[in-house]
Amino acid sequence: MFEKEISFIKSLFNKENIALHEPCFIGNEKKYLLECIDSGFVSSVGEFVTRFEEALKEKTKARFVIATNTGTAALHIALLANGIDENCEVITQSISFVATANAIAYTGAKPVFLDIDENTLSLSPKALEHFLENQTYQKDNLSYNKTTHKPIKACVIMHTFGLSAHIKAIKELCEKCHILLIEDAAEALGSTYENKALGTFGKCGILSFNGNKIITGGCGGAILSDDENLAKLARHLSTTAKIPHPYEYDHDRIAYNYRLCNINAAILFAGLENLELFLENKRELAKIYKDFFKNHDKCKFIDEKSNEKSNFWLNTLLFKNENLRNIFLEECLKNNIFVRPVWKSLPSLKAFQNCQSNELINTKKLEKRLINLPSSVRIANKKE
């Protein structure tokens, strides 16, 4: 049924096995790795961690950047630094990678799952507005859940597949109800809305540099913020809360060993030097996909919206029904083309089935019809 589509995808990558999103190392990775090894500083202290943080500040225009060993760790610390704990709740979207909900759960807080927007695949502003108007009340400059009577202190949105959420509308709703906005921009490095980097609209944002991201160090994450006090606390919590001293080991609270290692930072710093090239390449691939699937009779390409510039981390198709999606998925896999369905909705997972959620109309309508296409940067690694 999808012979033409499979042939087209094969022509784009010209490989026997086509990955969903493989790493691309074409710059100074080996050079910086050797420098890192020769320095003797390969763990959580070293020149490349600082250089990477400074370069990421320049790319995102965030005042402060704290590098961590994963995006999940970054989100966990961001929540803790904003005072999220077992005594409160956090709004988030129904479809996201499980790490979004896990990080909330690590703090002891309960996630409240709201529906996604059918165009952005991120949190629906309409669902958020309906929930805030009908299921919360205000007291002492806090929003409380009418069902549990617990304060809702934060809203975590995820910019799905590098596409921007309706970030301005969501931010306005959060500010109106005294709810902190935290952006899970794990998939959105290089994406912007109105020329402002995703991850820099809320109180803080996070990025991920896992092996399948647009740049990678094998692992890695980062917290972005313009709030100096929050940034200081986040850095403190991510480095075991060690009190600075020439030789004593003293720690003022329970904290975490989440600091990015210098050896990973060396690879990331090299990748960041090529970010603009990668973004240009990925946007070119997205246009090719968009043109091919335009007016397709079985699916449509999920495109960026006005005022948005996406990194198109994972190009995405929405099929007319689940059966068509499954046929496409199976035919691609038989031809060694790795495509994937979207994650199962978070409220459907065993760990979160007892958490509150609203009527997830779009979630139920979309989750079994979406497919991510191969989206690697199509630049050959340099030959030695």
Describe these PLM feature segments.
Residues 1-42, 374:
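N-terminal "arm"/small-domain region of PLP-dependent enzymes with the aminotransferase-like
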Residues 119-217, 223-224, 229:
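Active-site phosphate-binding strand-loop segment of PLP-dependent enzymes
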Residues 8, 50-54, 62-63, 126, ...:
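PLP-dependent aminotransferase class I/II
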Residues 107, 176-177, 296, 335:
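Helix C-cap/helix->beta junction micro-motif
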Residues 42-89, 103-106, 113-115, 137-147, ...:
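Phosphate-binding glycine-rich loop
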